[in-house]
Amino acid sequence: MPCLSRDLVEHRLPIKAGFKPYKQPARRFNPSIYDRIKEEINRLLDAGFIRSCHYADWISNIVPIEKKDSGKIHVCIDFRDINKATPKDEYPMPIADMLINEASGHRVISFLDGNAVYNQIFMAEEDTSKTAFVCPGFVGLFEWVVMTFGLKNAGATY
């Protein structure tokens, strides 16, 4: 999937003073879902959304969510610890009426694919290791190359 240029936008994860990196203890899951988790992780690897990570100070766990219609697993990440350490982006969101007025009359309103909008914005290279997560059924760590849901200020970056 094509991403926006890093020169245009990157998602960053600055850390507030006084916070130390935290590695969440590994969670256990029902072994019956390991194959479906592995399938989803392979899909994310093939898409280029994640990559192997050899060392990380911040490690989060996955939260597998089963889709009711297909039975497939959607992999969410528990970013609570890194989100606590990240300052809130205080840039105010524009008022909806102003956005609508500015957009009216234009042919192109968005150049992002609505299907995987967050995944079209790169993570800042120096912050990718902060998105590291451990996954049952795999040996090692993975990190997000692109911005994903659940990260603090992702909505503001988008």
Residue ranges: model-predicted function:
Residues 1-158:
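Retroelement reverse transcriptase polymerase core
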